[in-house]
Design a protein with these regions (language model features):
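Conserved N-terminal substructure of TIR/SEFIR domains
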Residues: 1-61, 80-88, 131-151
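Flexible, glycine-rich phosphate/dinucleotide-binding loops
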Residues: 10, 36, 67-68, 99-101
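A short acidic (Asp/Glu
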Residues: 12-14, 70-74, 102-103
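Short loop/turn segments at strand-loop or loop-helix junctions that form parts
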Residues: 60-64, 94-96, 111-117
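Short beta-alpha junction loops
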Residues: 64-65, 87-101
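Conserved TIR/SEFIR loop-to-helix hotspot centered on a Trp-containing motif
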Residues: 64-85
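Glycine-rich, charge-decorated loop segments at or immediately adjacent to ligand/cofactor-binding or catalytic sites
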Residues: 98-111
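Conserved GTP-binding G-domain of TRAFAC-class P-loop NTPases and closely related GTPase folds
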Residues: 118-132
Length: 151
């Protein structure tokens, strides 16, 4: 599973990543410290497509930083295209942005975004990320089960 997020404050994303890894899902963070992982950015488009398709499940932490960064916009378009083609499963988490204020390039996210409201404290945030991790794991297991029964 790939995890994408460019926000400056990573505690929500780190918490979700820990919960997913605890549940047995290997997570690769595409962005490190608000920047695209250098190895990933040096890949050509074909290699990026292959990497995303190989991992199949993408968790996208949408933030203003991602929407306003050229590298973030590139990866948003990449996951949009691959998701529309059915090559990846995309889970979009709203990282404290107003859905109504999404720029045009992020408008397609409006219908698939999972809203995470502002948390009062770290405990509440951790509980929400735990629940979100549970939901993602259930969806992944259900998807794998459905693939196996169709084959």
């Amino acid at each position: 599973m790939l995890l994408m997020g460019m926000q400056k404050k990573n505690s929500d994303m780190d918490s979700l990543m820990e919960h997913l890894e605890f549940k047995g899902i290997n997570v690769l963070n595409v962005f490190e410290e608000g920047r695209v992982n250098n190895l990933l950015w040096q890949m050509n488009t074909r290699k990026n497509n292959e990497l995303f398709i190989k991992h199949r499940y993408i968790v996208l932490f949408i933030s203003y930083e991602m929407l306003n960064d050229i590298k973030g916009a590139y990866y948003l378009e990449l996951v949009k295209k691959l998701s529309e083609q059915g090559k990846i499963k995309l889970y979009v988490v709203n990282n404290h942005i107003k859905i109504k204020n999404l720029p045009k390039r992020g408008g397609w996210l409006e219908n698939i975004i999972c809203d995470c409201e502002e948390c009062e404290d770290n405990y509440e945030m951790n509980c929400k990320m735990y629940q979100l991790a549970d939901d993602i794991v259930c969806n992944v297991v259900n998807d794998i089960f459905n693939q196996n029964t169709c084959n």
